[in-house]
């Protein structure tokens, strides 16, 4: 679990970004792994996010919708953020029409071919019985255990997956290609696929669509902006174009 000062610095960074976006935003989309771990006990939630949660509530109070797609780290997000912060929770892939462009949005976990072990684990952990059983573990133990497992998961990540593997090996690239081929008529094909699970900054042209991966905020800080005409991937706080790790220059 990161130390308190580092966690607070990261929290302030994303709050600054949210406050920067709010005056111009018609909607804000958070595509998962916002929390390293989250579980809502009947009478308690994980501490340490007061400023962030207050910022979310302030934004939705202004009438700006915030859509949250839970990721594999925060898949147990439930109705606390909905009731207390006004966030709209979306668990499955969802399509949005914005200024005539179609956006396909999802965290990205479990999509595409392969990765069967994770898909099985996801079914287990998203089952109501798993949540019911976990709630009987005291929060002090349960949350500490979850953070330890999360850290172990990051350390065990295959170093070969720290860079773009190419369209034929990337699960999400394969998913986008397969999904595009399955959509009919052509006018209903998404223009953009927005994901976050890969934790790499990617901007990949696949047939008629762009596959965008938003990177991460643990070490980097990238985000996408759509102004009604074009989509840019930017770096925070510089607001300069981000560089995708599939060797394409993006944000132009």
Language model features with spans:
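Active-site neighborhood of phospho(di)ester-bond hydrolases with catalytic His/Asp-centered motifs
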Residues: 28-32, 65-72, 106, 192-197, ...
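C-terminal regulatory/interaction regions
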Residues: 242-252
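Short, well-ordered, mixed-charge alpha-helical segments that flank or form enzyme active sites
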Residues: 75-79, 105-106, 112-115
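Conserved beta-sheet core of the metallophosphoesterase superfamily
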Residues: 86-91, 109, 114-121, 125-126, ...
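Beta-strand-turn-beta hairpins that frame and shape the catalytic cleft
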Residues: 96-104, 206-210
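Core catalytic region of metal-dependent phosphoesterases/phosphodiesterases
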Residues: 3-98
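Short polar catalytic/cofactor-binding loops
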Residues: 1-3, 238
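Active-site-proximal loop/helix segment associated with metal-binding centers of metalloenzymes
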Residues: 108-174
């Amino acid at each position: 679990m990161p130390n308190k000062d580092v966690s607070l610095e990261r929290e302030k960074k994303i709050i600054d970004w949210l406050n920067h976006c709010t005056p111009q935003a018609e909607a804000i989309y958070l595509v998962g792994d916002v929390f390293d771990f989250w579980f809502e006990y009947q009478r308690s939630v994980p501490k340490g996010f007061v400023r962030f949660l207050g910022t979310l509530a302030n934004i939705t109070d202004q009438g700006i919708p915030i859509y949250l797609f839970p990721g594999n780290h925060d898949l147990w997000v439930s109705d606390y953020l909905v009731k207390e912060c006004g966030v709209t929770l979306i668990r499955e892939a969802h399509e949005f029409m914005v200024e005539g462009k179609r956006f396909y949005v999802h965290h990205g976990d479990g999509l595409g071919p392969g990765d069967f072990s994770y898909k099985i684990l996801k079914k287990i952990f998203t089952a109501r019985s798993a949540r019911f059983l976990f709630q009987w573990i005291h929060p002090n133990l349960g949350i500490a255990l979850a953070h330890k497992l999360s850290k172990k998961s990051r350390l065990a990540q295959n170093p070969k997956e720290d860079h773009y593997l190419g369209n034929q090996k990337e699960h999400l690239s394969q998913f986008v290609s397969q999904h595009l081929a399955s959509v009919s008529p052509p006018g209903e094909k998404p223009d953009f696929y927005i994901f976050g699970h890969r934790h790499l900054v990617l901007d990949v042209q696949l047939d008629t669509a762009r596959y965008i991966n938003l990177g991460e905020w643990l070490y980097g800080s990238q985000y996408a902006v759509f102004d009604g005409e074009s989509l840019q991937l930017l770096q925070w706080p510089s607001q300069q174009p981000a560089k995708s790790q599939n060797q394409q220059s993006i944000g132009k």
